[in-house]
Amino acid sequence: MPRTFRNPILPGFYPDPSICRVGDDYYLVNSTFEYFPGLPIFHSRDLVHWRQLGHILDRPSQLPLDGVYASGGLYAPTIRYNRGTFYVINTLVGGTSKSGNFIVTATDPAGPWSEPYWLENAPGIDPSLFFDDDGRAWYVGNRMATDSRYDGHTEIWLQELDLAAMCLVGEPCVLWEGAARDAVWAEAPHLYKINGQYYLMIAEGGTSHDHAVTIARSGEITGPYKANRRNPIITHRHLGQDYQIVGTGHADLVETQFGEWWMVLLAMRPYGGYFYNLGRETFLVPLRWEEGWPVVAPGSGRVALAERTPDLPEQRWPAVPACDHFETQTLAPHWNFLRTPRDDFWSLCARPGYLRLRLRPERLTDLANPSFVGRRQQHMRFSARAALEFRPQHDDECAGLVLVQNNEFHIRFVITGGATPTVHLVKRSTPESNPQLMPIIPGTDVTLAELPIEGSRFYFKVEADGQAYSFYIATEPESWHPVAEGVDGRILSTPYAGGFVGTYIGMYASSNGQPSTNSADFDWFEYLGLDEN
């Protein structure tokens, strides 16, 4: 029997994958929107098992996310390698001090990466780079069509890139508007040169249920490009909203050192109805060439949960510990902040063995950088626990755990202050779902539970069984008291809340608009994915 692996290869909020190979090594990056550090970079030798090396943008000087709206920030990176240098090109959307397309470089994919080279006169999003075998470099991206006739009418355009000056030169040219008649949101372009032909692969249909991957080719890089008559080469939009994988699109291709071709792409796994709290995830699917065109998932034409393993030597990496005891000098790479941190609101040194969060006026509901350290929800069923030492000094002070889709759709599970500490479970959402991905609809707070609690050391537990989230508190290890069970988690999904991100779970502290000198100390945090089979 052939070996198989289980999709997705990166579960949880890891959208817009881009991949490149250097020798026997594979590198992959993803979008991160309003989260900091930006653009995780992963390394693999077998395309199935991945380890995170770090982030492309891990310094505030590289990534000004201040004031970025929910699901603004970093869109759709591309990673490429050329003559000893790695390049990542990306778009910052909605920046209050800087926005647009930029390039960063490194000679080691683990970093450090350069400061951004911002590109002038480069409109649109989803930029990609192509290095031709004659030494020339090219920028390819999408933008609103110059003769836009309908909402979502975009075009793919090309211009030469001067690598020495890091600027666009020559005249831009339009390559394609997509395969479908009146195609919407032609985006995510990548160029490849295979057997002397230039192939332009894009996504179209929008990054939700109607997502698709299409392709065209030309003998000249500037075109004209002829569409594959068998487009789209992959989509699941015809399979219905109750199919186990939906929204397939935004793909990139890689050829192994042994001549196999594979595609990485995003998709979603709905559960509890058409809701996908895990966001858009990274999947892997085989590809072969027939009559000069790619055939994706030969024999089925579908992205599968169980797929044959690439013909590569297996390379597993040490497992990431389920429990973080905060005993290192730096945060593990799976931890993120909301927007760019501009002060030292967190510390692993102030109290060794603890993550200390300083209470600040910023709230989770603000488009700000609150005292929040979180990680992705990566399983439909999971258990997360944490130990917190905290003495609230005023009614406005709180600390605990939060589940976050965005600033208007989240759940706060916190200890609040005053003479008698109280456990508060608060849901922020709207009464009805958001029918559009953007903009985010303002939400309101609803208290689901509150109860007084004694002590200064608290144990939190959140368990999810599909869309049912349950919350427990304790003052002694494993002596759990239910706060609320079976809370509806659908507000944590994009089809309800809008936007483009997946759910985060993490640690949070705030003085809710008031000054404070207090802090919250988290002794440990554990996240355990439970069997979904």
For each of these PLM feature ranges, what is it?
Residues M1-N533:
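Carbohydrate-active catalytic/glycan-binding domains of CAZyme proteins
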